[in-house]
Design a protein with these regions (language model features):
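Active-site anion/phosphate-binding pocket segments in diverse small-molecule metabolic enzymes
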Residues: 1-10, 14, 65, 84-86, ...
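Active-site-proximal beta-alpha core segment in soluble small-molecule metabolic enzymes
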Residues: 4-7, 12-15, 28-187, 191-197, ...
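Active-site phosphate/pyrophosphate- and oxyanion-stabilizing loops and adjacent acidic/basic residues
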Residues: 18, 146, 350
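Conserved PLP-enzyme active-site core in the AAT-like
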Residues: 23
Length: 366
């Protein structure tokens, strides 16, 4: 076992996937958002469980992520959420990925690639209802559909939008976005096979109007709630723990500083322990002098600045080299959640989990 590793509890993932599926009506299909390596949890492992639990598809951010899943043997529909550039299109076509297009995408290039491949490309129509990121504005949908008539190898498979404030307590802005989405849908050739999707994690929990016929939960698959201000919550389990081990202990004498810049000075003689994880592993430097870890079931505060590959904590006299350190997860009666870590780092759980790229993953069933 490596000195530092990330433990992914597959049973927790399965639990969350079951809870989400049970929360939605049977007539609403569900895909698993597994972009960014399933928010750091392992895309292949997460998608395998999702399909076993009745999910019908996967969503990724980029064409290369979808290609990796195809190469791993997955045959389910794979939606790409980000717009493709011409250099992405041959891979997307070859791997049968469902790519999004709006009026900025090079449809001539896409049509040419499809024609050579003798394939019809299924595409999604992203609608910009207020996120102002990608997509066609509702009033421009008729023109886009008219434009598509000139491309016989490109077929509109469905449409989606993204709510910017669905995780807020007040839903007025999200509902206005759904009004705009309804306007866009009214122009489209909707039949029983046309996919309509607007329910992100917060929408899945809180906004039934957003469910349509395909929900796309993301963060809630992995345990965190979309936000701490939402009225409703699901019974979710955190699937990720981060584990390391003490490599060094020492006495820091009164008046001595520790770490780069000497930002922490001992007020009295104290014991410190060194943990071999740093910001290169994704443990945010903003946790310097603020974050905590668990050693022997006790909370130990980070002292000094987090280094590239290590950081130091204050600890009691019982701590020894080799002792287990929990950065996220449970130890004894104590627990540090990703929500606590992200709040301390002044960011969101998504970023904390996605940033932990260098730490090896160990998959367990607990």
């Amino acid at each position: 076992m490596p000195v530092s590793y990330m433990e992914i509890n597959l049973n927790a993932l399965r639990h969350n996937l079951k809870v989400i599926r049970a929360h939605l009506p049977k007539e609403v299909n569900v895909l698993a958002v597994v972009k960014a390596n399933a928010y750091g949890h392992g895309a292949k492992e997460t998608l395998r469980i999702a399909l076993e639990e009745g999910y019908v598809a996967a969503a990724v951010a980029r064409v290369e992520e979808g290609a990796e899943l195809r190469d791993a043997g997955f045959t389910c529909p794979i939606y790409v959420l980000g717009l493709p550039l011409p250099e992405d299109m041959p891979i997307g076509v070859n791997k049968d990925l469902i790519m999004p297009i709006d009026d900025t995408v090079d449809l001539d290039a896409m049509e040419a690639i499809a024609a050579v491949s003798k394939k019809t490309i299924e595409v999604m129509l992203p609608i910009d209802t207020g996120m102002n990121r990608i997509g066609t504005h509702p009033e421009d949908v008729p023109a886009l559909l008219k434009k598509l008539e000139a491309y016989p190898h490109i077929h509109a498979y469905g449409t989606f939008t993204h709510m910017a404030t669905a995780d807020h307590k007040e839903k007025d802005a999200a509902l206005k976005q759904l009004d705009r989405f309804d306007e866009a849908i009214s122009y489209m050739p909707v039949d029983e096979n046309f996919v309509i999707s607007s329910a992100n994690s917060a929408g899945v929990i809180d906004i039934p109007r957003s469910w349509h016929n395909l929900a796309r939960p993301g963060i809630i698959i992995y345990g965190p709630q979309p936000s701490d201000v939402m009225t409703n919550k699901l019974d979710l389990q955190y699937a990720m723990s981060v584990v390391s081990h003490v490599t060094h202990v020492q006495i820091l004498h009164k008046g001595e500083a520790i770490g780069y810049g000497g930002t922490y000075v001992a007020k009295e003689d104290m014991k410190t322990a060194t943990v071999p994880i740093g910001y290169a592993d994704g443990w945010h430097r903003s946790l310097s002098n603020k974050g905590v870890v668990l050693i022997n079931g006790k909370r130990c505060p980070i002292v000094g600045r987090i280094c590239m590959d290590q950081f130091m904590v204050a600890c009691d006299d019982e701590v020894r080299p080799g002792d287990e350190v929990i950065l996220m997860g449970k130890q004894g009666e104590e627990e540090i959640t990703v929500d606590e870590v992200s709040a301390t780092a002044e960011t969101i759980p998504h970023e904390i989990m996605c940033d932990l790229k260098r730490i090896p993953r160990v998959f367990v069933e607990k």
